[in-house]
Amino acid sequence: MKKITLIGSELAKTGNEFIYLGPLEECEPCRFKRICHNNLDVGTRYKIVSVRSANHPCTVHENGVKVVEVMPAEFTIIIESKKALEGVTLTHVDVHCDRVCCENYLSCHPEGISGKYRVSSILPEKVECKKGNSLKKISIVPVQQ
């Protein structure tokens, strides 16, 4: 489902993705606060699907903000193989691993997942785990609560 929000004019490009982290102190007195923040869920990754041309003033973004339409972004993560079933809805749990230098660490511990998601596809590429975990790379879409 598409949502309307505001984002910095320099960042407002169709296809860009961002993780919403919540309002800043500087946002409190702003007349655009509700449209900027009330439609988004903290910790969720969004993709910009359209950008409107009007520019609005903002104390946080140097060149102002633009109105954009966003939707939760589909993205790729790594999970335990036994949970990787296409179409299933899961609540995310990071893969148990403390090897922060591993090439897969960020995919096993992704940012921008809050709540539940649906496994949209299981990717065919093999995932090597130095700890011996059986892992799969999947594409997911957040489920609206």
UniProtKB/Swiss-Prot annotation:
InterPro entries named among the record's database cross-references: UPF0179 (IPR005369)
Disulfide topology: none
Domain of life the protein comes from: Archaea
PANTHER family per UniProt: UPF0179 PROTEIN MJ1627
Family membership: Belongs to the UPF0179 family.
UniProt protein name: UPF0179 protein MmarC7_0952
Organism from which the protein derives: Methanococcus maripaludis (strain C7 / ATCC BAA-1331)
